[in-house]
UniProtKB/Swiss-Prot annotation:
This is Cation transporter HKT1;3. Residues 1-46, 129-190, 285-321, 404-421, 515-530 are cytoplasmic. HKT transporters are proposed to contain 4 pore-forming regions enclosed by transmembrane segments with each containing a potassium channel-like selectivity filter motif. It comes from Oryza sativa subsp. japonica (Rice). The keyword Ion transport applies.
Amino acid sequence: MNHCLVVSHKKLQTFRTFAASKFSSFTKSAQKSIKYSFQFIYQNNPLFVHVAYFALISFAGYGSLKVLKPRDKSNTLKDLDVLFTSVSASTVSSMATVEMEDFSSAQLWVLTILMLIGGEVFTSMLGIHFMRAEFGTKESVSTRDHSPCIDIESITSTKFGPSTQGTKVTVSFSELRMENGGHVEPKTIKFLGFVVMGYLLITNLGGSLLIYLYLNLVPSAHKILKRKGIGIIVFSVFTAISSVGNCGFTPVNENMIIFQKNSILLLLILPQILAGNTLFAPCLRLMVWSLEKITGKKDCRYILEYPKAIGYKHLMSTRESVYLTLTVVSLIILQTVLFLSLEWSSVALDGMSNYQKIVSALFQSVNARHAGESVTDLSNLSSAILVLYTIMMYLPGYTSFLPRHDGEDSKTEKINKRKGLLENWIFSHMSYLAIFVMLICITERDSMATDPLNFNVFSILFEVVSAYGNVGFSVGYSCKRLLNHDARCKDASYGFAGKWSDNGKAILIIVMLFGRLKTFNMKGGRAWKLR
């Protein structure tokens, strides 16, 4: 009897070991299958991956915002407005249909996370992670039997020129390697990933600390937040991440208008905005250059010498970085000069000192590309400035005047001609904007008929371009502009879109997503010839 029990026990133990090994083997196989399947989809249809990513975080944010209670528990937010806000934060658009002070501290933290993981720097860091996964089983790119084309928002070769506006060209790593005369080691990509992560941490934590210190040292700014019941830590972290991510949200209803006389605070935020978008590439190159001087690492030297070989679009040559910086600075100066020339004695800058006016003009000019924070009521600005801002919001972040040398059109522009032909038949950005404006004019036609001063074509165009550029500027809605006075009308601090119908808001959600993914259509519409 005992012998039978011993034999049964041994058989059971053997079966357990066998089952455990098979289960472990199955788990590893499943993980590899999922990994390689995802890599295959990512390489062949990265647009699908990006759409899925932003849809996932947007709906996750929507669910979190719905579960958490707003500040005023009796004020129930509409489902569409909550989804709109979640998409707006995820796509760093800062378009608003509800007042920010309606959200509780817990909900503000959710929006902070959405702005962080939806920002350009963070998503580009994810791109580097997938690039590392692609090289995980190889010693280096040069030893690969084939070099797949990776068409991803951050892993692209970007050509700059007077007519390209940062045209994205999909190229294989082998072609990049031949063009640049080197090869990429996996450890170099890993190092770059750590550099971008460090950049993200330094800008966000450093920005939060600077804002926190200012609010503690300046009683007038501290009193504003105390009066509104907003914690300093929440405001500091939220505003810093929003600024670096170029989202444009702030925890207060008035955005930065309430701090328009706190010029030092505005000047502290300006570098964060530039470092997170239009000057990210030059700042990243400066960081790599500094690390090379301090550590002498070969990886830094390689990245500086062959930025295109990495395949990370935010890595630029010295020449490209200089021209991009000059373009950004020139556009800021142009906007600031025009703003001060036209608005110096206007209502928008009323009550400010000369110094505060200059800082406010500079702040507005920087935010037009593409952060969206504001220190003035845009509805009080002249039409010329609003047209200027519309143009600035339309321009891509890396728009640069870069004179092209003879022979600069290299092999990369000849690759994937078949795909380029398909892209030519896709509508251009201007075509999409025209379609979206027409659709919203249709959904809001009743309001345009009864309230033409608020619901006019330019206001709708301004709102659509702002959403498509992921900026967040809005001319707002004013009860004073009603033709027939309505005692029930109440002015609100949120954007003009907050007064739109549900259909109009739904279309604007699509516009924000289109705008966040517009880098996949930088060459669209070339088949259309106007003669």
